[in-house]
Amino acid sequence: MSIVNSELDKSISTHIINNTNIIMAHYCNGSCAHNAYHTGYDKGMAVGMLAQQLLQSACPPVGVRTSYDLWGTVQPVRRYTCSYQCPYAGGAECSMCFARRVNPSGSPTYNPGQNSAPTILLSLAPGTSLSIGGIKYI
């Protein structure tokens, strides 16, 4: 299963829920190698869909939460820390992930005007789909 970036961009860019940024991740082949796409806001203005490449590694054991940093391309650069959990050791599926934004110094920021809204990572196993608010994500 492949993700068509333009279609993904269109669906997510037009569906921001409660000022919450959405990251879509695709897991495949029994590993956590994936691309994440997120829509961000900087000083209240949409900056569009930004592609991020997450670290590639085997899924951690059941119950283990692992954090990765996502570096955005808007200025100033902000760090996205995301923890996720794999339901199966080495499995292709990973659970939904809730991430928070932090500023470059590493301290949390929650000012909506400073690109600090909560972020949700939606992880899909190959061949699956997800619907939120009537919007179906590939």
From Swiss-Prot:
Superkingdom assignment: Viruses
Name listed for the protein in its UniProt record: Uncharacterized protein R314
Species assigned in the record: Acanthamoeba polyphaga mimivirus (APMV)
Lineage of source species: Viruses, Varidnaviria, Bamfordvirae, Nucleocytoviricota, Megaviricetes
